[in-house]
Amino acid sequence: MEKANPMYSSIYSQFPQYFGDQPWTAGPVYVGAFVMFLFVLGCFIVKGPLKWALLGATIFSVLLSWGKNFMGLTDFFIDYVPMYNKFRAVSSILVIAEFTIPLLAIFALKEILGRPEILKLKENRTGVIVSLVLTAGVSLVLAVAPSVFFSSFVTAQEMAALQQGLPAEHLTPVVTNLTEMRKAIIASDAWRSFFIIVVGCFLLFLYQQKKLKASFTMTLSLIHI
């Protein structure tokens, strides 16, 4: 909120920091930046059917959370899965992902602590690079250029409300300032996520180089998570 113009503070107090299409939503589902890195890495270094079950459940819960954006799957569950139509919000199904993502991340951490050399293996280098690109890389892009992923920072509903409640001469300054505020919020969160991932990876690197003990690394990683 550092970029907020004090002149319009009473207006901004009526809008949440979240600016998506979901009504009555204060923010997105959050599982942790370093957890996401370990989750993606786990897709490469964890072996066995449990990995595929956790990955499948994660993807499935995300698809179900799309609701009207994936009506075929949503309608099927509403029609054929008992009690599914009692959910007040389809996004509540993401509680599955909030369980499966950290669980696979923990399995990945277990593999690394049990076999420090696992990240040096040639077949796992691609996994490390992909994990960094999809987590730290995306966070860095969001931090430097938030506009890359968003065409607008003010929803159509918010714009309509502002047009009705503000004089024409104040509309453009308010929209511009609100846009800058939300860009700053995204950049701040993205920088934090980027540094969390970098610090977490550095801890794993130190453990791999035998500079840290397993118990100490696990403790720091769990705190980091």
What do the predicted segments below correspond to?
Residues 1-38, 182-191:
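Individual transmembrane alpha-helix segments
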Residues 9-11, 15-16, 43-44, 63, ...:
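Mixed-charge, polar/low-complexity N-terminal
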Residues 34-40, 199-203:
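Hydrophobic, membrane-inserted alpha-helices
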Residues 46-223:
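Contiguous transmembrane helix-bundle modules in multi-pass membrane proteins
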